[in-house]
């Protein structure tokens, strides 16, 4: 699946001397998943309602033309966190390249069998090792006294491999427990922000929920809003997912 960076509230603090600033900025990095670039109110969409994102965009500098050299999840996330193109950080796919597993019929069974193989696990370990050879944003910020949190999509093993001080992902292929963020709860993120503020620590929070990515299971109250005005039932579900994601941004900003 494709990932589209949404509103990346990342300030260019790494290029500055933090000692020269009165106070290091807090950073919240927001990444939506499988979200068409035009499906925002501030981008002119009439199909979806995104009031919270529109408000954020109105307060921000918006870059409407962004391009990636690899539209897969893992490589794109690696580029966001390292500031490097794919050919430099070396993460060219979500998974290591593997031959087909014999005896496993069906795409689902074949994928499950492959991901349990020793060769696959070793390949993933090598990808993570390669990723760690690049400068990684949470690690660099940690050297400047930041605390950091990983939530949502994450392909590079447990959150610690990215230099985060806290996180939800324990090491699953693309996020495991981290994928609960946004869909089931915002507590890990809001609790982290409250704790960092209480402790007087500058923070970096990575919010990359699996929204509006499938499975498209929006709340019924939102789906009902789009049933009659979307061209297809599937489009209605997707549009409702986009607004659901927007609601989480409002909840976070209100915290």
Question: Model-derived features: where do they sit?
Answer:
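Formylglycine-dependent sulfatase
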Residues: 12-255
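Bacterial N-terminal signal peptides that target proteins for export
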Residues: 1-8
